[in-house]
Structure formats: structure tokens, C-alpha cells
């Protein structure tokens, strides 16, 4: 197994570069592709806020101005798709204080947050899409599977390299969770059976 927190992702420099040119960087991509790990590795100087936590999410939803004021130097706002209305408040915040790279948002690409970011933050946000680990990234880390078949079957999700879990078990559960959570939300399907 390999410590994925030590893996240098190709998107690292892109996050840094966009942070010099935009007040907000939005790191998006599929679930479990390493967004949180990359955000924390790229910007260890920023406070970290996990909006999956019900208390943090409630604070951001109920008092967005107070929530953002809690982080005068900015923060990593992880799983920002849970508070899509925050985009308008971030717009107002960065229009007053134009410091570059102050906010680093992470979240899965979902229509609600994508629409909010596109409408409210145009010209204020640099977007980086983080895909699962590439063959080049694995080769650089010395973790490239020995056969192309293994690489294609395994894919590049970090959990498959740093956990003791079979590819079959992990991918089966990943797909099931995706269908149950994301597809239902996107299509408003009530019964997937």
C-alpha cells in the first residue's frame, strides 16, 4: 500500500497558480478522487472547514456572513456543494477584500453548486478539475501496476492504493453509493429498485 497523502498530484501547481490569480479556487471532481487531500497539501496555511459536518453546515446556511467572518484570512471550504447559496456570499466577500487565493473550495461537480459558482463567481474563481490518479502520477510515485490490464481494471481512485480493500469490493460499493446518493438527487428518482 502507498501513502496517498505523499503523492504529488499534477493539479498541485495548477491550484497554486490559480490561487495567485483568483480570490477563489474551486477544486472539483468525482467523489473520492483526492480533492480534500490535495487542498490541504496545497494550502496548509488556510483553516480547514468540513461542510459535511452538520454544525458547520448549519452555521454556513443560517448565518453565511458570520460564517465567512469567522475566517478573515480565508479557509478551505470542503464539500461546498452542501451549501450552494454560499456562492453569493463569497462574491460579496471577495468584492470587498480582493486578496488572491483566500478561499479554496472543494466539492463534487453538482448542478446546484456549479450554477451558483457560474452565476455568482464569474471572473472571481479559478476552477480545477481533479480526476483520479493518472498513470503518470503513479509511475512518478513508483506505484504503477505492472500490467496495463491491472491499471485499467484498478483505476486511479486513491483508496485502491492506500487501503487493504479489493478492487471489486471498493468499486462495487462506490458505484452503489453513487447511484443511491448522487443519481437519485440529480434525477429525483424515488425508487431505484
Regions found by a protein language model. Give the residues of each.
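Short regulatory helix/loop adjacent to the ATP-binding pocket of P-loop NTPases
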Residues: 111-127, 140-143
Amino acid at each position: 500500500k502507498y501513502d496517498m497523502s505523499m503523492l504529488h498530484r499534477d493539479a498541485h501547481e495548477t491550484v497554486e497558480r490559480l490561487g495567485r490569480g483568483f480570490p477563489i479556487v474551486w477544486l472539483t471532481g468525482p467523489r473520492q478522487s483526492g480533492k480534500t487531500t490535495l487542498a490541504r497539501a496545497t494550502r496548509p496555511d488556510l483553516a480547514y472547514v468540513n461542510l459535511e459536518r452538520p454544525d458547520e453546515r448549519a452555521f454556513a446556511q443560517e448565518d453565511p456572513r458570520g460564517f465567512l467572518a469567522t475566517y478573515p484570512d480565508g479557509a478551505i471550504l470542503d464539500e461546498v456543494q452542501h451549501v450552494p447559496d454560499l456562492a453569493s456570499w463569497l462574491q460579496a466577500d471577495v468584492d470587498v477584500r480582493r486578496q488572491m487565493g483566500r478561499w479554496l473550495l472543494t466539492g463534487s461537480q453538482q448542478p446546484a453548486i456549479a450554477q451558483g459558482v457560474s452565476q455568482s463567481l464569474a471572473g472571481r474563481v479559478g476552477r480545477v478539475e481533479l480526476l483520479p490518479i493518472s498513470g503518470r502520477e503513479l509511475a512518478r510515485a513508483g506505484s504503477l501496476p505492472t500490467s496495463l490490464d491491472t491499471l485499467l481494471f484498478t483505476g486511479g481512485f486513491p483508496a485502491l492504493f492506500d487501503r487493504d480493500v479489493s478492487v471489486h469490493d471498493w468499486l462495487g460499493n462506490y458505484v452503489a453509493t453513487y447511484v443511491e446518493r448522487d443519481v437519485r438527487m440529480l434525477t429525483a428518482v424515488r425508487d431505484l429498485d
